[in-house]
Amino acid sequence: MALADFALVVGIDSYPGLRPLKGAEADARDFYDWVTDPAGGNVDAQNAKRIVTSDFAPLADSADGAKPVRDHIEDFFKMVNKAAARNAQAQQGIAAGRRIYLFFSGHGFSPSLDRSGVLMANATDDMPFNIGAQMWADRLYDGGWFEEVLLFQDACRQHFPSADVTPPFFQSRNPPQDPPRKRFYAFSAKSGLLAVERPLANGHTRGVFTSTLLEGLRLGAVDAPSGDVTTNQLKVYLESNMQKKLTDVELEDADISKVPEVSHADPFVIVAGRPGAPRTNATFPVELRSAAPGKILNNDFEVVAENFTGPPPWTAKLQRGLYQYVLPGGGTTLFKVTGALDASQQPVVTIVSV
């Protein structure tokens, strides 16, 4: 029998002991909708746990009574461990499931380059109660609780050297090497930098990372030939598109992360292609600026556009990927079509100047 997939989705807006957030719960709800959608993550709702601020209404006025706290998140991991025990008893191996999605949106911190924590609702400046999201992902991966581990964290990663991340309570274990395990981690900010939430085109406040992430997962990060949403394409999509949602002021702020931190980006399919899936062969505008028209070659050195007529600039529509613009005299310019979208969700024109 095939192993099940799991998902933990956490979004915390209310921090009585810190600055409140406006978009973390909305981010979590949107991710939960995607991860339980049969056309998205396809995780059975009985294996998906969503924990958000409004679950604990009326909200506490002080940090002492604020929720969710670490116990609420750790209850999910207890369920995971029980699933692994059931599978072992049924002689299905020691894994709890095939894949797990871990999504966290809220305040966060990073005491060092290799550690990252998400603050719980009862956190204060002098009592940073937290969950070690990255450490949990590492423990589930290293111990073979899942074959595939995906971690998405939309939270700041400011350095607090005096604070430490709360480690997992699972004991380390050495799993069999087969089947080979894979993982993919993406953080909204690089270590030491801030993440941003802001009103987007629809007027709703959202994390710019989560908004970009879900665009990619909803077939924006499709591998054109296969129709699959892959980790490779999602990495490119996140690194190319998140900064498009930042304002000019935010782009100039040295404390704000312009691109996400993507690590352990093992190659695998996140969402398998489906016949007729939208945007599988999506094309994006390219503007060519040169003295004379040339031709465009793809990564396999095949001509994909030529015979441009009329005065410059010339235009073309291309799928995501790497290309060469070759001029009649032999000059060559490399360029990439990323599929980036602007704040109104319209494709950004790739300009190629020679």
Identify the role of each PLM range.
Residues 1-20:
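Short glycine-rich His-centered loop
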Residues 7, 95, 222-302:
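Caspase-like cysteine protease fold
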Residues 11, 22, 28, 35, ...:
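Active-site-proximal C-terminal subdomain of hydrolase catalytic domains
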Residues 28, 33-97:
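Functional beta-strand-loop-alpha-helix junction segments that form "active/interaction loops"
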Residues 66-166:
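Caspase-like (clan CD) cysteine peptidase catalytic core
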Residues 260-263, 330-354:
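Structured interaction patches on ligand/partner-binding surfaces of diverse proteins
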Residues 300-312:
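Short, acidic Ser/Thr/Gly-rich low-complexity loop/linker segments typical of extracellular
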Residues 320-331:
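A short, solvent-exposed beta-strand micro-motif common in secreted/extracellular proteins
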